[in-house]
């Protein structure tokens, strides 16, 4: 058993305190959603509870799955079957249940009633609990159960969302405590474009999981420990002997300070020896070295926070130093379980299928990333009680995480193979940011692109385009300087984020300001302007939307109204898919499709001045509400006027 170390770490204000998280309220799923076997009557009761719960209904897919689960348990009580419900193309209906073929293959020759997949599908339909959400069902082909949703129910669902809030459309996820490890820059180094993907992908995953009612720990595992600090501290002492008196002026530009110390470390063997001695003295806890380390960490943290503030990202720092005191106990536990072996002077864990072992103690007796990561995982599982731990890094670290997770499974910390079992870990890998030349994105002088400079340029370009648009339309006088600044930031930073998030994270993508700031196509600019246009439609109607919510009624009478309504109510399942598969681009695709479907609706259905004005204004408002929630989940500020 690993106890809490007497000294948790050499603490610093940059690494903050070491609070133990209290166990938050868990979100309990109905048993039908958790996989526990229910009698048909109980399953039907669970379905009714989900559908009628005024606070949280889950996705349409989840609600339909509960109905079909009840039917499958009633029709085939001897089989343990999970319903396979998915959205389908319009010519077949709105959704499909695709269990029949699989069930029939299990029942071949064992049932006189179910002679073919089609009869299985008909049996499933016959035992469906009654529900207002389903208008029609039919069996097609080899047993596919086609489902048509009730337009009246769809309209009521949208109206309920407008009355009770978008939170009622949050999906139901099985994990209740999730830790997302993302961003994680190194102390004393400036954040660059390479940190962009981890920061915004991790932030979006955290936002989606929080919306889905998980308790989320946003963890910044900064590199605040290791040999580089001996180099930095020794350079500080030798260059500015009076560093304590002159304060931060001694360090100045932290990036330049790092480069200068690294140059000495690489070129001066005597300095290198002194730097290595400084590491030993720091790790032994000498006050002078600890104070210098604190000072460097504090300066770095403030610079990081300026970037996070601009990106709207919130993180809690628990750096490498926090977990350092836990490493000996964790390694002792792993050794007692027979996992750690000696190999060529190092202590290692051999992983099945891997030629190279996972090194946990180096030849010189020092710790490394693997030993720190194992200690961090132990802490996160045993102290913070996380159900799901997600690591957001580049794909180049995939092998490390494969081996690291395998070691944790061998230790019995994680389930061996069942991907649905908890606790679990996931590595969210992502590709490179490329320049126009197809190579890693760098400045003309081959330096990495500083994230601060990139954000500055995004805002400045956005502001220039906005000013040009307003001057051409004659609306510039209607805007205050503050509105211009905030809108330029929203569009500029949003464009940078969306250009990244709309891509499958595993792929590389080419960074182009011209493309991401284009107001046509699948860009943040286009989507933000689309949202602003919807807000303008509502304003120009002269109607108070809050009054309409109380007295009006949505009717999905026109084909394009129904298409838009159907896409709106699929919001929750798209968030669910994005969370489950850890793919933010799923939400981006949904948002872009929503804008497209609204455009078609607006082109074919007159809103202001029509007989259906109230209903259609409410549909406009529902679209704007869902778009705003999508923007929020993607970390993008909405724009209300253009």
Label each PLM-derived region with a short phrase.
Residues 1-20:
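N-terminal chloroplast transit peptides
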Residues 20-21, 26-155, 162-166, 172-642:
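Non-catalytic interaction-recognition regions
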């Amino acid at each position: 058993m690993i106890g809490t170390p007497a000294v948790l770490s050499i603490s610093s204000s940059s690494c903050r305190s070491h609070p133990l998280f209290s166990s938050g309220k868990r979100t309990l799923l109905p048993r039908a959603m958790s996989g526990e076997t229910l009698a048909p009557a109980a399953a039907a009761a669970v379905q009714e509870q989900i559908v009628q719960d005024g606070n949280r209904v889950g996705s349409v897919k989840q609600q339909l799955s509960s109905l079909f689960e009840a039917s499958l348990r009633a029709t085939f009580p001897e089989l343990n079957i999970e319903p396979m419900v998915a959205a389908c193309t319009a010519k077949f209906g709105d959704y499909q249940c695709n269990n029949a073929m699989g069930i029939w293959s299990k029942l071949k020759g064992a049932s006189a009633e179910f002679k073919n997949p089609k009869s299985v599908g008909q049996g499933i339909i016959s035992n469906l609990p009654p529900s207002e959400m389903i208008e029609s069902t039919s069996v097609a082909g080899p047993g596919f159960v086609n489902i048509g949703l009730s337009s009246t129910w769809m309209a009521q669902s949208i109206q309920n969302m407008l009355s009770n809030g978008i939170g009622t459309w949050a999906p139901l996820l099985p994990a209740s405590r999730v830790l997302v490890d993302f961003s994680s820059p190194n102390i004393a180094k400036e954040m660059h474009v390479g940190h962009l993907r981890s920061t915004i992908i991790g932030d979006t995953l955290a936002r989606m999981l929080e919306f889905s009612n998980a308790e989320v720990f946003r963890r910044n595992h900064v590199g605040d420990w290791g040999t580089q600090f001996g180099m930095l501290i020794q350079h500080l002492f030798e260059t500015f002997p009076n560093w304590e008196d002159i304060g931060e002026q001694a360090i100045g530009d932290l990036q330049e300070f790092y480069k200068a110390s690294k140059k000495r470390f690489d070129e001066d063997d005597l300095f290198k020896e002194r730097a290595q001695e400084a590491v030993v003295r720091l790790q032994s806890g000498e006050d002078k070295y600890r104070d210098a380390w604190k000072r460097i960490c504090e300066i770095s943290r403030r610079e990081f926070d300026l970037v996070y503030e601009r990106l709207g990202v919130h993180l809690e720092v628990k750096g490498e130093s926090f977990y350092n005191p836990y490493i000996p106990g964790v390694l002792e536990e792993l050794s007692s379980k027979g996992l750690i072996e000696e190999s060529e002077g190092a202590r290692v864990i051999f992983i099945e299928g891997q030629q190279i072992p996972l090194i946990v103690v180096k030849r010189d007796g020092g710790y490394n990333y693997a030993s720190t990561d194992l200690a961090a995982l132990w802490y996160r599982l045993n102290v913070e009680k996380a159900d799901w731990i997600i690591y957001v890094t580049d794909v180049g670290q995939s092998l490390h995480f494969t081996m690291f997770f395998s070691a944790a499974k061998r230790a019995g910390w994680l389930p061996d193979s069942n991907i649905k079992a908890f606790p679990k870990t996931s590595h969210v890998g992502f590709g490179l940011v490329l320049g126009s030349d197809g190579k890693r994105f760098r400045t003309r002088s081959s330096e990495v692109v500083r994230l601060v400079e990139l954000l500055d340029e995004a805002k400045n370009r956005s502001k220039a385009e906005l000013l040009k648009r307003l001057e051409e339309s004659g609306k510039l006088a209607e805007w205050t300087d503050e509105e211009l600044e905030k809108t330029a930031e929203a569009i500029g930073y949003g464009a940078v984020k969306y250009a990244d998030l709309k891509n499958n994270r595993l792929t590389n993508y080419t960074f182009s300001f011209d493309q991401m700031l284009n107001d046509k196509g699948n860009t943040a600019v286009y989507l933000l302007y689309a949202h602003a246009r919807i807000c303008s439609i509502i304003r120009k109607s002269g109607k108070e939307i809050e009054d309409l919510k109380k007295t009006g009624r949505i009717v999905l009478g026109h084909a394009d109204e129904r298409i838009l309504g159907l896409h709106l109510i699929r919001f929750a399942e798209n968030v669910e898919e994005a969370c489950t598969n850890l793919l933010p681009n799923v939400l981006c695709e949904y948002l872009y499709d929503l804008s497209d479907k609204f455009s078609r609706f607006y082109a074919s259905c007159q809103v202001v001045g029509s007989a259906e004005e109230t209903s259609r204004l409410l549909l406009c408002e529902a679209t704007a509400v869902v778009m705003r929630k999508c923007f929020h989940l993607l970390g993008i500020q909405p724009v209300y006027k253009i």
